[in-house]
Amino acid sequence: MTAGSVAAPQIIPIRIPPPGKAKHEIDSSTPVEIKSESPDVRVLYTLDGSKPELTKRPGFADSTLKYTEPVRLPVGKVYVKAMAISIDGRQSAVVTKVFVVEPSASDERELNAHDEDDSVKNDTAIDGKDVVENGTGVSSVKYLDISSNEAHRALKGPRFLSQRLGPGSSARLTAQNSQNQSADVVESPLKNLTNTQISRIQRETDFLRCPKCLSHRPSDPFARFCLHCGAPVPPIPGQRLPPTEGGQMGLCMHCKTMVPLNTAICVVCESPLDQQLQPQATLRLQDKFICHSCGTGNPAHITHCVTCESQLLRQARPVLSGQRAAPVPSSQGKMVSCSKCNRVNHSDARFCDWCGAKPGHKASSVKCSQCGASSHPYANHCGGCGVFLDGPPRMPLQVNQRQDAEEMQQTASAAELATAPPSVGLRMCADAQTQTVGLFFPSNTELKKRSQQREAELSRQEQMRDRKPLLTAISPGRGFWRKQLDHICAHLRSYTQNNTEFRALIGEPRLGRMISAVIQEDSYEVSLRINFISAPPEESRSSSAGQRSRSVTSESQNLSSVTEGRNSASPENNINTTGSEVKKKKKKKIGTSDVTENQPESKDSLLLKEVGPEGRGRIPAVQQLLDEGADPACLGKDGRPALVAAVLNGHHDVIPVLVQREADVNQASGPLKNTALHEAAALGDEGLKSVEILLGCNASIRKQNDRGQTPYDIAVAAGSSSVLSLMAAHLGQGLLLRHTKARSLSGLDTFS
């Protein structure tokens, strides 16, 4: 036996082994002891061969007994099964032992005495007298005269019941035992049945419950299926039809005579009428379809007539999916609120679709759409055909109200049409609306699933995100440039957070693209200088290149005046320094001045150079300079903008780029205050392409310079016929559009 297990009980008969008999052969007076070697256990046993059970199963007899003292077995072949159970619920193995119990000599004497008492009682009952013992009357019962050899193995009554009821009940028990013995003799075929067989017989003979789910039988006597599980229920014994009405007549199937149906037999041929009145649910006439062309009857399973082969017209019927019945459409659109959650449901709803509670109003019966039978309002299956009853579909309140209004409108229109004579060829139609998209409410499971997916996505993003570099005292060097940059950024951030003056200075300027970086290294320090383009503020984008260079110089002075650990350094404070330190500072100052002198040109100057006579007017280069902060309206040394310089130098491809970047196409410049179109017209045929592009960019032809000349006047003076025709065409098109717009406005005023 393993550790912690409960020892199986032992079944031992308490007797001296008689010679010539086996161990399992005992008599009815031999006590049988059941014990287990494990302490603090209780023993359960059965005498009908079934397994001992700790809890009683519903629908089965309680045959499990608790062992308290040695028991005596009844006469016959007895199967004793025992099991030990500990306090904490651990169970032992089930032990089975079979005994062949024979009646003892004392039992035979008691049985003979009871037989004599039975004969006396029978005589008394025949004479019509009552047997009175200890003042108690026992009603007369008719007993059968059974020979002693058939009743010598009858079971006796309870042995220990007299001790519990007291000494005064011995006479009553004697009379009851005699009655029970006589009844046992009559019901002898059920004596040797096991508990399982008795339960099966009880289940088969219990007509008030369903044999599958043990639910109550439908109250309708003609219901053939269970309302809860849909299983077929056995018919009630002696089922009868409801009583016929007075004067109801029917046709007798034997003599073909109309006879009254309220009689048991036919008054003519005396054949029974009960069998003829039984409903024949299994018999069904074959469906037929009549052909509209030739009038031939056709079977229901074909689609074309067997005679003329024309297509048969079938009647529309509800589509039923297998063993499910569609809900019957309700004509009432009333809604009822739930008493628990205040959810608005249909008036014919059996349960609330939110909380599942039953409605507080009185529910009517449920009607099956397949066979038309009425069932219990909370039935799951039809009692007539056994199909599953689907619930009514959920429809919004607005749709119901709209349908009610449409029905009322259709009713009113139908009444009007009924009074008026129908016109020939008028087709009656009505508009119908339906809802195709409904509201969606996610369930609790779907909400949990979404939150879990969101958390998993966040954790995955956290794992993929680059970790911030740790702030260390010394960088690795040796070519690890990524770690070097991380070291520089981390120390620069830490220094900026701890130094308020440097933090204020670094937060002021608007930095552009980094243009250069210089590193100087000696045995003591590593100097790093980084130069950025100073982006001008929004209000001063048209500043000159000289102002930009001065801002860059001032910014470099501000940044160089603040160094790590030397914020207030001056020549007076460094008098006592060593020679090496003075030499190092001189070297650093010399390097700084060289860098300042070798600063690159500004973006505006590079833009003017690109559109100037030395430049090539490349569109990508101009776009890059504009993206890096160059001003499209910047002025050159002669006071002319970049747009005019592009026209004069023949770079007409960059004109749309400058105009798109907010360059003024009508900006006047130069000594005569000419615009870009003036300069293009003065070039003659060489500036034809520039004139065409400027006119496409909405350059003004009526703009005058200081001499009062327009671009058209300058083109006339230059003698370029192509430029004149182009300007005339553009001017005429503008006048035509302006005149057309004026006419359209006047026409609208006239008709208004």
Curated annotation (Swiss-Prot):
InterPro entries: Ankyrin_rpt, Ankyrin_rpt-contain_sf, DZAN1, DZR, Ribosomal_eL40_sf. Residues 555-580 have a biased composition (Polar residues). Pfam families: Ank_2, CHB_HEX_C_1, DZR. Residues 536-554 have a biased composition (Low complexity). Disruption phenotype: Morpholino knockdown of the protein results in small eyes and severe pericardial edema at 4 dpf. In addition, dzank1 morphants show impaired ambulatory activity. Morphants display dysmorphic photoreceptor outer segment (OS). Retrograde melanosome transport is severely impaired in dzank1 morphants. GO terms for cellular component: cell projection; centrosome; cytoplasm. It is found in: Cytoplasm, Cytoskeleton, Microtubule organizing center, Centrosome; Cytoplasm, Cytoskeleton, Cilium basal body. GO terms for molecular function: zinc ion binding. Keywords: ANK repeat, Cell projection, Cytoplasm, Cytoskeleton, Metal-binding, Phosphoprotein, Repeat, Zinc, Zinc-finger. Coiled coil: none annotated. Its main location: cytoplasm. Residues 448-471, 536-614 are annotated as: Disordered. Required for the intracellular transport of organelles and vesicles, and is essential for the photoreceptor's outer segments formation, maintenance and function. ANK repeats lie at residues 638-667, 672-703, 707-737. The lineage of its organism: Eukaryota, Metazoa, Chordata, Craniata, Vertebrata. Residues 448-469, 600-614 have a biased composition (Basic and acidic residues). One of its GO terms (biological process) is regulation of intracellular transport. This is Double zinc ribbon and ankyrin repeat-containing protein 1. A zinc finger (DZANK-type) spans 210-270, 338-386.
